[in-house]
Regions:
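Structural detector for short beta-strands of small beta-barrel domains
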Residues: 2-14
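Short aromatic-glycine-enriched beta-strand elements
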Residues: 14-23
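Beta-strand/loop nucleic-acid-binding surfaces
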Residues: 28-41
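Flexible glycine-rich surface loops and low-complexity tracts that mediate binding to linear polymers
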Residues: 44-53
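Hydrophobic residues embedded in beta-strands of well-ordered beta-sheets
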Residues: 53-54, 94
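Metalloprotease/metallohydrolase-associated module, dominated by Zn2+-dependent proteases
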Residues: 62-109, 113, 130-201
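Active-site recognition of the HExxH zinc-binding catalytic motif
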Residues: 117-129
Length: 201
């Protein structure tokens, strides 16, 4: 059983307007569900997911039609990526720049950037992109997920952003010469999506 926050919803046009596709994310793991819902919950509502059954405020809402989890992906730290992070077309690999710190200290607490940027930003961004949302909106949703995760560590968002920004400026100054090699084969450009817009908060 888990708790998921609604981040978006649309009418299911294939069901004559009588059901809705609801997207919700559990920021802790993180994991994502798409729900075939009989009513329209507000964005920000908390859903309870038990198996494939979904409820809102103790009342049945619908069924899970799709589920994705951080457990389904791997994070690669092997490549020189100018814009720090990105993801493969199939969503099975998250990429973080090899020169970006994997941990840093914010307000006396260690923060894993593999978790905060890789799994709590890049991954939700990919989930939203796969649902047809354009980059700026997917990025906005992902930044909100990242913020919830960071604050759950007892770190302020401003303190975290200041530390990320300091390190991003250093990474931005590097030239992306090549993507390197993985498993003995070079990665073709059409198999890699880099986050080409600046990382903004």
């Amino acid at each position: 059983m888990g708790t998921y926050r609604v981040v978006e919803h649309i009418k299911d046009r294939s069901a004559n307007g009588h059901s809705f596709n609801v997207m919700a994310i559990d920021f802790k793991e993180p994991s994502y569900v798409k729900v075939k819902a009989v009513s329209l919950p507000k964005v920000g509502s908390l859903l309870t997911v038990d198996g494939d059954s979904v409820s809102l405020d103790g009342k049945p809402l619908g069924k899970v039609s799709e589920k994705k989890s951080a457990d389904d992906v791997r994070v690669s730290l092997k490549f020189d990526i100018k814009y720090t992070g990105g993801y493969s077309m199939d969503g099975k690999t998250i990429y973080l720049d090899e020169h970006f710190p994997k941990f840093f200290t914010v307000e006396g607490k260690n923060v894993s950037t593999v978790e905060s940027i890789g799994l709590h930003h890049e991954l939700p961004e990919k989930w939203m992109s796969d649902n047809g949302y354009e980059y700026p909106y997917a990025h906005e949703i992902a930044t909100g997920i990242e913020k919830m995760y960071v604050e759950s560590l007892g770190v302020t968002w401003k303190g975290y952003c200041d530390e990320v920004d300091k390190n991003l400026r250093r990474v931005y100054s590097r030239l992306l010469v090549s993507l390197g090699y993985m498993d003995g084969e070079s990665i073709p450009w059409d198999e890699f999506i880099s986050t080409v817009l600046p990382y903004t908060f």
